[in-house]
Protein backbone atom coordinates (compact mmCIF):
# COMPACT_ATOMS: atom_id res chain seq x y z
CA UNK A 1 0.00 0.00 0.00
CA UNK A 2 1.24 3.43 -0.91
CA UNK A 3 1.92 5.92 1.87
CA UNK A 4 -0.69 8.37 0.49
CA UNK A 5 -3.34 5.63 0.38
CA UNK A 6 -2.50 4.59 3.95
CA UNK A 7 -2.76 8.20 5.08
CA UNK A 8 -6.16 8.61 3.38
CA UNK A 9 -7.48 5.40 4.95
CA UNK A 10 -6.30 6.50 8.39
CA UNK A 11 -7.95 9.90 7.93
CA UNK A 12 -11.23 8.27 6.88
CA UNK A 13 -11.12 6.00 9.93
CA UNK A 14 -10.48 9.00 12.19
CA UNK A 15 -13.34 10.92 10.59
CA UNK A 16 -15.65 7.93 11.03
CA UNK A 17 -14.56 7.63 14.65
CA UNK A 18 -15.21 11.33 15.26
CA UNK A 19 -18.65 11.06 13.64
CA UNK A 20 -19.54 8.09 15.84
CA UNK A 21 -18.31 9.99 18.90
CA UNK A 22 -20.43 13.05 18.06
CA UNK A 23 -23.44 10.83 17.39
CA UNK A 24 -22.99 9.10 20.75
CA UNK A 25 -22.67 12.45 22.52
CA UNK A 26 -25.87 13.69 20.88
CA UNK A 27 -27.67 10.52 21.91
CA UNK A 28 -26.43 10.92 25.48
CA UNK A 29 -27.59 14.56 25.55
CA UNK A 30 -31.03 13.61 24.24
CA UNK A 31 -31.26 10.79 26.78
CA UNK A 32 -30.29 13.16 29.59
CA UNK A 33 -32.86 15.76 28.47
CA UNK A 34 -35.53 13.06 28.28
CA UNK A 35 -34.64 11.81 31.77
CA UNK A 36 -34.90 15.36 33.14
CA UNK A 37 -38.30 15.85 31.48
CA UNK A 38 -39.56 12.54 32.89
CA UNK A 39 -38.40 13.49 36.39
CA UNK A 40 -40.11 16.89 36.11
CA UNK A 41 -43.35 15.25 34.92
CA UNK A 42 -43.18 12.73 37.77
CA UNK A 43 -42.53 15.50 40.31
CA UNK A 44 -45.50 17.48 39.01
CA UNK A 45 -47.81 14.44 39.05
CA UNK A 46 -46.81 13.11 42.48
CA UNK A 47 -46.06 16.27 44.45
CA UNK A 48 -47.72 19.08 42.49
CA UNK A 49 -44.36 20.82 42.10
CA UNK A 50 -42.58 22.13 39.03
CA UNK A 51 -39.73 24.41 37.98
CA UNK A 52 -40.63 27.47 35.89
CA UNK A 53 -37.64 28.65 33.87
CA UNK A 54 -38.81 29.11 30.27
CA UNK A 55 -39.41 32.82 30.80
CA UNK A 56 -37.73 35.71 28.99
CA UNK A 57 -35.12 36.30 31.66
CA UNK A 58 -34.50 32.57 32.28
CA UNK A 59 -35.22 33.16 35.97
CA UNK A 60 -35.70 29.93 37.91
CA UNK A 61 -38.93 29.82 39.93
CA UNK A 62 -40.17 26.88 41.97
CA UNK A 63 -43.92 26.23 41.75
CA UNK A 64 -45.50 24.71 44.86
CA UNK A 65 -49.17 23.67 44.98
CA UNK A 66 -51.05 23.16 48.24
CA UNK A 67 -54.31 21.37 47.46
CA UNK A 68 -56.97 19.26 49.14
CA UNK A 69 -56.46 18.56 52.82
CA UNK A 70 -53.25 19.22 54.76
CA UNK A 71 -52.26 15.78 55.97
CA UNK A 72 -51.01 15.39 59.54
CA UNK A 73 -49.29 12.47 61.26
CA UNK A 74 -51.94 10.00 60.10
CA UNK A 75 -52.37 9.09 56.43
CA UNK A 76 -55.61 10.22 54.83
CA UNK A 77 -57.77 8.03 52.64
CA UNK A 78 -56.31 7.17 49.24
CA UNK A 79 -59.48 8.68 47.73
CA UNK A 80 -58.69 12.11 49.20
CA UNK A 81 -56.52 14.74 47.60
CA UNK A 82 -53.93 15.76 50.16
CA UNK A 83 -50.79 17.81 50.70
CA UNK A 84 -48.20 15.89 52.70
CA UNK A 85 -45.96 17.97 54.95
CA UNK A 86 -43.24 15.29 54.81
CA UNK A 87 -42.99 15.99 51.06
CA UNK A 88 -43.14 19.78 51.33
CA UNK A 89 -40.71 20.47 54.20
CA UNK A 90 -37.64 18.72 52.69
CA UNK A 91 -38.33 20.42 49.35
CA UNK A 92 -38.44 23.84 50.99
CA UNK A 93 -35.11 23.13 52.67
CA UNK A 94 -33.69 22.11 49.29
CA UNK A 95 -35.00 25.33 47.71
CA UNK A 96 -33.34 27.45 50.40
CA UNK A 97 -30.04 25.67 49.82
CA UNK A 98 -30.21 25.95 46.01
CA UNK A 99 -28.69 29.24 44.80
CA UNK A 100 -30.19 28.76 41.32
CA UNK A 101 -33.79 29.08 42.59
CA UNK A 102 -34.68 32.78 42.69
CA UNK A 103 -38.34 32.72 43.71
CA UNK A 104 -41.25 30.62 45.00
CA UNK A 105 -44.83 30.71 43.71
CA UNK A 106 -47.43 29.01 45.92
CA UNK A 107 -50.83 28.03 44.47
CA UNK A 108 -53.53 27.25 47.04
CA UNK A 109 -56.83 25.42 46.83
CA UNK A 110 -57.18 23.75 50.21
CA UNK A 111 -59.95 22.91 52.66
CA UNK A 112 -57.54 23.07 55.61
CA UNK A 113 -56.41 20.16 57.73
CA UNK A 114 -53.87 19.43 60.44
CA UNK A 115 -52.89 22.54 62.43
CA UNK A 116 -49.32 21.51 63.27
CA UNK A 117 -48.56 20.41 59.71
CA UNK A 118 -50.07 23.57 58.22
CA UNK A 119 -48.20 25.88 60.56
CA UNK A 120 -44.95 23.98 59.97
CA UNK A 121 -45.23 24.55 56.21
CA UNK A 122 -46.24 28.19 56.71
CA UNK A 123 -43.29 28.86 59.03
CA UNK A 124 -40.88 27.28 56.56
CA UNK A 125 -42.16 29.39 53.66
CA UNK A 126 -42.09 32.56 55.78
CA UNK A 127 -38.45 31.95 56.71
CA UNK A 128 -37.16 31.49 53.14
CA UNK A 129 -34.60 34.06 52.00
CA UNK A 130 -35.91 34.19 48.41
CA UNK A 131 -38.97 36.22 47.26
CA UNK A 132 -42.28 34.37 47.69
CA UNK A 133 -45.79 35.01 46.32
CA UNK A 134 -49.02 33.10 46.98
CA UNK A 135 -52.20 32.85 44.90
CA UNK A 136 -55.49 31.61 46.38
CA UNK A 137 -57.59 29.95 43.68
CA UNK A 138 -60.73 28.03 44.70
CA UNK A 139 -60.28 28.56 48.41
CA UNK A 140 -57.84 28.55 51.31
CA UNK A 141 -59.83 27.65 54.40
CA UNK A 142 -59.05 27.01 58.05
CA UNK A 143 -55.31 26.30 58.41
CA UNK A 144 -55.04 27.34 54.76
CA UNK A 145 -55.29 30.97 55.96
CA UNK A 146 -51.77 31.00 57.48
CA UNK A 147 -50.49 29.28 54.33
CA UNK A 148 -51.99 32.04 52.18
CA UNK A 149 -50.45 34.91 54.15
CA UNK A 150 -47.01 33.43 54.88
CA UNK A 151 -45.46 34.74 51.63
CA UNK A 152 -43.98 38.17 50.91
CA UNK A 153 -47.06 39.08 48.85
CA UNK A 154 -50.44 37.40 48.42
CA UNK A 155 -53.15 37.32 45.75
CA UNK A 156 -56.65 35.88 45.56
CA UNK A 157 -58.83 35.41 42.48
CA UNK A 158 -62.16 37.34 42.47
CA UNK A 159 -64.17 34.18 43.25
CA UNK A 160 -61.69 32.73 45.75
CA UNK A 161 -62.86 32.17 49.33
CA UNK A 162 -61.28 31.98 52.77
CA UNK A 163 -63.02 30.55 55.85
CA UNK A 164 -61.91 31.53 59.34
CA UNK A 165 -63.34 29.41 62.16
CA UNK A 166 -62.38 28.09 65.62
CA UNK A 167 -60.16 25.05 66.00
CA UNK A 168 -61.95 21.71 65.71
CA UNK A 169 -60.81 18.38 67.09
CA UNK A 170 -61.82 14.88 66.02
CA UNK A 171 -61.94 11.85 68.28
CA UNK A 172 -62.49 11.78 72.04
CA UNK A 173 -62.55 15.17 73.78
CA UNK A 174 -62.34 15.39 77.59
CA UNK A 175 -64.86 17.85 79.00
CA UNK A 176 -62.52 19.76 81.30
CA UNK A 177 -61.31 23.34 81.60
CA UNK A 178 -57.83 22.22 80.55
CA UNK A 179 -59.24 21.12 77.18
CA UNK A 180 -60.69 24.58 76.59
CA UNK A 181 -57.37 26.18 77.54
CA UNK A 182 -55.57 23.87 75.10
CA UNK A 183 -57.96 24.90 72.32
CA UNK A 184 -57.32 28.55 73.19
CA UNK A 185 -53.57 27.98 72.96
CA UNK A 186 -53.87 26.40 69.50
CA UNK A 187 -56.08 29.25 68.29
CA UNK A 188 -53.64 31.81 69.67
CA UNK A 189 -50.82 30.25 67.63
CA UNK A 190 -52.88 30.60 64.46
CA UNK A 191 -54.13 34.12 65.22
CA UNK A 192 -50.65 35.33 66.16
CA UNK A 193 -49.08 33.97 62.98
CA UNK A 194 -51.74 35.40 60.67
CA UNK A 195 -51.80 38.84 62.31
CA UNK A 196 -47.98 38.96 62.15
CA UNK A 197 -47.88 38.19 58.41
CA UNK A 198 -51.02 40.02 57.23
CA UNK A 199 -52.46 43.51 57.68
CA UNK A 200 -55.27 42.43 59.99
CA UNK A 201 -55.21 43.03 63.75
CA UNK A 202 -55.28 40.11 66.18
CA UNK A 203 -58.58 41.21 67.79
CA UNK A 204 -60.35 41.72 64.46
CA UNK A 205 -59.22 38.29 63.26
CA UNK A 206 -60.53 36.73 66.47
CA UNK A 207 -63.90 38.45 65.97
CA UNK A 208 -64.13 36.94 62.48
CA UNK A 209 -63.22 33.52 63.90
CA UNK A 210 -65.92 33.64 66.58
CA UNK A 211 -68.65 35.21 64.42
CA UNK A 212 -72.06 33.63 65.19
CA UNK A 213 -74.14 35.34 62.49
CA UNK A 214 -72.92 33.82 59.21
CA UNK A 215 -72.66 30.02 59.45
CA UNK A 216 -75.73 28.02 60.49
CA UNK A 217 -73.94 25.07 62.09
CA UNK A 218 -70.61 26.59 63.05
CA UNK A 219 -68.84 29.73 64.21
CA UNK A 220 -66.72 31.71 61.83
CA UNK A 221 -66.67 33.88 58.72
CA UNK A 222 -66.39 33.22 54.99
CA UNK A 223 -64.71 35.97 52.95
CA UNK A 224 -64.85 36.15 49.15
CA UNK A 225 -62.27 37.78 46.86
CA UNK A 226 -62.19 41.53 47.51
CA UNK A 227 -63.49 41.05 51.08
CA UNK A 228 -60.23 39.35 52.06
CA UNK A 229 -58.32 42.42 50.84
CA UNK A 230 -60.60 44.84 52.69
CA UNK A 231 -60.13 42.85 55.92
CA UNK A 232 -56.35 42.95 55.47
CA UNK A 233 -55.80 39.21 55.03
CA UNK A 234 -54.70 39.27 51.38
CA UNK A 235 -52.71 41.99 49.61
CA UNK A 236 -54.45 42.09 46.23
CA UNK A 237 -57.10 40.54 43.98
CA UNK A 238 -55.53 39.04 40.86
CA UNK A 239 -54.68 35.96 38.85
CA UNK A 240 -51.64 34.01 37.74
CA UNK A 241 -50.26 36.77 35.49
CA UNK A 242 -50.44 39.25 38.38
CA UNK A 243 -48.77 36.80 40.77
CA UNK A 244 -45.92 36.07 38.37
CA UNK A 245 -45.45 39.76 37.53
CA UNK A 246 -45.18 40.61 41.24
CA UNK A 247 -42.76 37.74 41.82
CA UNK A 248 -40.52 38.95 38.97
CA UNK A 249 -40.54 42.43 40.53
CA UNK A 250 -39.55 41.08 43.95
CA UNK A 251 -36.83 38.94 42.37
CA UNK A 252 -35.47 41.93 40.46
CA UNK A 253 -35.38 44.01 43.64
CA UNK A 254 -33.66 41.20 45.56
CA UNK A 255 -30.95 40.80 42.91
CA UNK A 256 -30.17 44.52 42.60
PLM feature segments, named:
Residues 1-135, 139-145, 150-165, 169-256:
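N-terminal organellar transit peptides
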